[in-house]
Each structure stands twice: as structure tokens, then as C-alpha cells.
Regions:
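N-terminal beta1-alpha1 ligand-phosphate binding loop
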Residues: 1-23, 27
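Conserved RecA-like P-loop NTPase ATPase core
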Residues: 5, 58, 92, 125
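Short glycine-rich anion-binding loops that position phosphate/pyrophosphate groups of nucleotides
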Residues: 11, 62-65, 93-96
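Conserved strand-to-helix beginnings and helix N-cap segments that scaffold or border functional pockets
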Residues: 17-20, 69-73, 102, 122
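Catalytic-core regions built around general acid/base machinery
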Residues: 23, 75-79, 104
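S-adenosyl-L-methionine/SAH cofactor-binding core of RNA-modifying enzymes
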Residues: 28-88
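Short glycine-rich, acidic/polar surface loops and turns
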Residues: 86-100
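Structured adenosyl-cofactor binding patch, chiefly the S-adenosyl-L-methionine
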Residues: 99-144
Length: 145
């Protein structure tokens, strides 16, 4: 399974860039995982619609479904087991995704009830994806219940 984490807009903070690179490096040990900066929502929709095999698209939005770390790990493992070829997690712009993008998504996911800066949400997502893979592999990083 190819896992892609994309975010819309330029990254302004050097600290966010460093954390993004750190977690993408950690995630690279668990499979074909990459990050990408896209200019716009239109670029995301074009990428999703032009793929030979339609990807599973997960949009991050404060109005989305909330999962525990364990539930996210279960979701990722289920995609691996059923042979999902391409899974895209997209962190939107500060104002969120439009209705057409939300309609195209397979899942709209929220990181919680609090509002996060979209650059920070990217880092939280990457950490949660890393945590999920450590849960799947039985690595001691996760110390949940």
C-alpha cells in the first residue's frame, strides 16, 4: 500500500518543516510513505481523480469523525489486509475543505474537538500515523490502554 500525506499551501515554519521531515523519516521504515505539498485543493482533486486506481482519500477537517489511536491503527491495518493500493491523507487549508472535496472523500477525519493550526495538524497526523504503525507492529512506542 502506498501511503501519501499531502498538505495544501506553503509551509512557513522551519520547526514544522523539521518535524514533518522527522516523522516522514520515521514512517519510511513502515512502507512506501511520502509527503507532498500541494498548491491548492484543485491540485488534490486532480491528483485523486487522475489516478489509474482511485485512491482511498481521507480528508482532515474539524467536522470529521474522531478516532482513537488504536482505531486509526485498525483502519490502516484493514486497508493493508484488503490490498488498498493507494491511501491519501490530506490536511486542508486554514478554512477547511470545500463541499465537493468532502463529497469525494472516503472518510473525513477530525483530530479532535479543538481547533488546530493546519500546519500543526499535519504534524499531529504524522505522529498519529507513526503511532498507528508502531501499534500494528507491536513496537513499545505506544503506551495506551
Amino acid at each position: 500500500m502506498k501511503l501519501k500525506v499531502v498538505w495544501l499551501g506553503k509551509t512557513k515554519s522551519a520547526a514544522i518543516k523539521a518535524l514533518t521531515e522527522e516523522y516522514l523519516d520515521r514512517l519510511s521504515h513502515y512502507g512506501d510513505i511520502e509527503g507532498a505539498e500541494l498548491a491548492s485543493e484543485a491540485a488534490l482533486l486532480k491528483m485523486a481523480e487522475s489516478s489509474k486506481t482511485p485512491p482511498t482519500l481521507v480528508l482532515l477537517d474539524q467536522r470529521g469523525r474522531q478516532l482513537t489511536s488504536e482505531e486509526l491503527a485498525e483502519m490502516l491495518e484493514a486497508h493493508q489486509l484488503r490490498g488498498t493500493q493507494s491511501l491519501i491523507f490530506a490536511v486542508g487549508p486554514a478554512d477547511g475543505f470545500t463541499q465537493p472535496a468532502r463529497h469525494l472523500a472516503n472518510l473525513v477525519l477530525s483530530l479532535g474537538k479543538m481547533t488546530l493550526a493546519h500546519e500543526l495538524a499535519r504534524v499531529v497526523l504524522l505522529e498519529q500515523l507513526y503511532r498507528s504503525f508502531t501499534i500494528i507492529k507491536g513496537h513499545p512506542y505506544h503506551r495506551g490502554e
